[in-house]
Amino acid sequence: HAALISRLKIMAELDISEKRMPQDGRISLRIGGRAVDVRVSTLPSAHGERAVLRILDKGDANKFTLESLGMSGDSLSRFKRLLRQPHGIVLVTGPTGSGKTTTLYAGLSTVDAATTNVLTVEDPVEYELIGQTQVNAKIELTFAKALRAILRQDPDVIMIGEIRDFETAQIAVQASLTGHLVLATLHTNDAPSAVTRLTDMGIEPFLLSSSLLGVLGQRLVRKLCVHCKRQDGQGKWHPVGCTECGMSGYKGRTGVYELMVADDEIRGLIHAQAAEAKLFEIAQLNGMKTMREDGDRLVGEGVTSLEEVLRVTRE
């Protein structure tokens, strides 16, 4: 075990003599002609160090399209409409590992790179795209510092890997108010709670109501294996398990989404500092389908199972 951890730390260019402190690194590999990035995180424990690896396919960002993400036709057309706006802020929200960055890159693929200056600030850079800046805590290049520098590079579209603090949120909102389209991710449970998170960080409601275009909440669900899924007497599909899917009944993943578009009514509620529940209620009345409802659509289409949707969504 210790030898394996040491080998991983050498490959990730970590300090192999330091066993008392957590460390983060990365390994760049080429497997089958494809560039693969492995993020390595080590943590001391009672019985030696433990390591977790996260594998990223560092391919071309343009391989992602919004059409391939599994959105409903209505959400897809509304989301594309937001991305065509000349300025404002579009947020993608969800827990860690819910596909937020992939959605942002798919959104960027709709932008005409020949006529639009697209710049990104990420930690770390996940997919290849011209005009990326990687945050580096070791040299104190924070999201906020990188964003300030990027604003002097005449960007049309700015993508922020994650809004983590007030300073980053403030610059993002100001940038969206001064003629830039800003795409960013945030960690919240659903689309309307992104508004509460930003105001809790210290963003003035009148600034947020003026700049916000919309919020996309999302989760990832496993797709039923097409080789072995079974339909019951009521027409519902269930996982079975075969050699194709490693006996799990599932193969591949897709997203469930909810899109809150900031129309005049939603902007008014944000400005008036309305409760999260009220935002949710009005967003639904104005056409927002919840993640649970979107999941029900996938269940009806036989893409995933009801158990999967219930696992990742809440009432």
What is the predicted function of each stretch?
Residues 1-315:
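Short, flexible helix-loop junctions that flank or precede catalytic/ligand sites
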